[in-house]
Each structure stands twice: as C-alpha cells, then as structure tokens.
Design a protein with these regions (language model features):
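Conserved, structured core segments of small domains
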Residues: 1-102
C-alpha cells in the first residue's frame, strides 16, 4: 500500500492561548489518532515545529488512495469542530530510510 504525506493546519476554532493538549475535546481527538496509529493507518506524525506553537501537523499515512485519507480525517472529532483541517495530501515516493519498500 502506498504512503502519503498529509498536512493539516489549525483551524478557525483553535484557541492559541491554550496548549494543544488542553484544546476542546483533546481526549476524543487523541483517542481517534491513537486508534489510527494502532491500526497502521498513520505510521508517523505530529506537529511541525514546537508542539504548542506549530500551525501545521504532518502525518505519514499508509492508505490505498487520497479519498480514503480524506474520509478518515473527516472522522476526527476536531475536523467538524474546525480545530484542524486537511490542507494537502501528497503521494510519497520513499527512496531512503525505513519506510521504503525493500
């Protein structure tokens, strides 16, 4: 199954005065992301830059296509709350490192 790089950014409802782990519905969002990790859908991910100052989050996703990724990210509790939104989904050709096919 191919890899994709998914970039999400903080949405209009993000409260910049509050740390990431204290945003509304953090526990629900974290449980959702942990489940995607456990099933191997997300193989790596996290904020770009320092955790609480980062405007963007990057994930390496193992999925058949971008439509599947869009559908799964829409299930994140933070998506309809406008805390996070997906801004790009790009196929990733891995040439170096542990993610490449051998």
């Amino acid at each position: 199954m191919p890899y994709f790089v998914v970039v999400r950014e903080r949405g209009s409802a993000w409260d910049w005065s509050v740390p990431m782990r204290r945003q509304a519905e953090w526990d629900s969002h974290a449980a959702f992301m942990d489940a995607l990790d456990a099933e191997g859908f997300i193989v790596a991910g996290g904020p770009l830059g320092t955790e609480d100052a980062a405007a963007h989050v990057m994930h390496i996703v193992n999925a058949p296509d971008s439509e599947t990724i869009e559908a799964r990210m829409a299930e994140d509790p933070w998506t309809p709350m406008e805390l996070l939104k997906t801004v790009s989904i790009e196929p990733w050709t891995v040439l170096l490192g542990g993610f490449r096919e051998r």
